[in-house]
Regions:
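Beta-strand-centric surfaces of beta-sandwich/beta-rich domains
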Residues: 1-369
């Protein structure tokens, strides 16, 4: 995970899903079944939902029907390089019945992932992959990647339980998942922000990276999450500008959020701890600031920013082998019939995720799907 900033030019991410391939409107009498039950072809245990040739990796498989009860779909089979690596009842698979590595959080049933089930065990292949289910397919999507060559690719084997990975994932939101850095330096300070003011909470010079960022907000924290902004400059350019809540995954307000690379956690004293572990390299300098966009002073904030000096980052950034961490935020009403644009970036980079918040136009907490 400490190598996340490194960019690759030889991979492509694709998705197969249950959209209506005829371009028609949703038909309540048949559901979103593509006119053929969603199958791409017949094969495997019945209905092929994804297939690829060449080197690649299956990253995510998601289904729903019957409020997440997928028993009626029967078996799922995953064939990689001509060998079957999964052949089991789908419900048993997402319940964790096959054992590691097919256990939570790499698989989840509807109780663990509301209204849908998933399999997120990475399954690389060198020559081919095919995923099929027995019957009663409705809504699904399969995310996979294609590699330009087979160098370094080993076909997935379910005999490797990946217990170290599972331990790391189960600790998500509580610890930094990256390897420890012995040369890390902590920048600690208390923050008192006047109305409309900006405060620098950490600065660093030389080649290095921001390894983690922690903030503690006093209770009540909702206003601070919505109206305080986090800004980060790398090498004299601002690439992070976001409300605290959205950046730390709590855009709807003060509530617990646990993710692998960030977290918002209520503490026993009622305060909220915000943590971020994205690796953020810079060549010459970095500055982290908090901006108070409210008409009132905000105080009682504790900040701890960890930086790690490392000479590798300056030449890697200069050559384009590494990218700058970027997080922008924008908000506004949607327009009927028009797409909502999350990002429109140019050049070479790596997409790592979206934190988004939806509020209903009439009832703020009502937005359906």
């Amino acid at each position: 995970l400490d190598r996340l900033p490194y960019l690759s030019a030889d991979t492509k991410t694709l998705q197969v899903s249950s959209f209506d391939r005829t371009g028609g409107d949703f038909d309540i009498t048949t559901g979103n079944q593509n006119g053929s039950g969603g199958c791409l072809a017949s094969g495997g245990v019945g209905c092929v939902i994804a297939e690829d040739r060449g080197a690649g990796e299956i990253d995510s498989i998601w289904f729903t029907r019957d409020n997440g009860n997928v028993t009626r779909m029967g078996a799922i089979r995953v064939d990689l390089d001509g060998h079957t690596v999964v052949d089991a009842p789908l419900q048993s698979l997402v319940d964790g019945g096959l054992g590691a590595p097919f256990v939570w959080p790499l698989v989840a049933n509807a109780a663990q992932s509301p209204a849908g089930v998933y399999v997120k065990v990475p399954m690389p292949y060198r020559q081919s992959m095919r995923i099929s289910v027995a019957s009663n397919l409705q809504y699904y999507h399969v995310d996979y990647r294609q590699f330009s060559n087979v160098e370094g690719v080993r076909t997935f084997s379910p005999s490797d339980p990946a217990l170290d990975v599972i331990t790391t994932l189960r600790a998500a939101g509580t610890i930094d998942p990256k390897p420890p850095a012995p040369s890390a330096a902590h920048h600690n300070r208390g923050v008192e922000l006047a109305a409309g003011a900006t405060a620098t909470i950490a600065e660093s010079t030389g080649s290095g990276s921001i390894s983690s960022l922690r903030l503690r907000l006093p209770n009540p924290a909702d206003q601070a999450l919505n109206r305080l902004r986090l800004r980060i400059e790398f090498d004299d350019r601002t690439t992070v500008d976001s409300p605290l809540g959205e950046f730390f995954g709590a855009g709807l307000g003060a509530s617990d959020v646990r993710s692998l690379m960030f977290a918002t956690i209520r503490q026993p004293d009622g305060s909220f701890s915000l943590s971020d572990w994205w690796p953020m390299p810079f060549a010459r300098a970095a500055r982290v600031s908090l901006v108070n966009a409210t008409a009132d002073p905000v105080g009682g904030i504790d900040a701890d920013v960890v930086t790690v000096p490392d000479p590798q980052w300056a030449p890697a950034l200069a050559s384009g082998r590494v990218g700058y961490f970027t997080a922008y935020s924008h908000a506004g009403p949607t327009i009927l019939g028009q797409d909502w644009l999350f990002a429109d970036e140019q050049g070479h980079g790596k997409f790592v995720g979206v934190s988004h918040t939806i509020r209903g136009s009439r009832t703020k907490t009502s937005f359906s799907d």
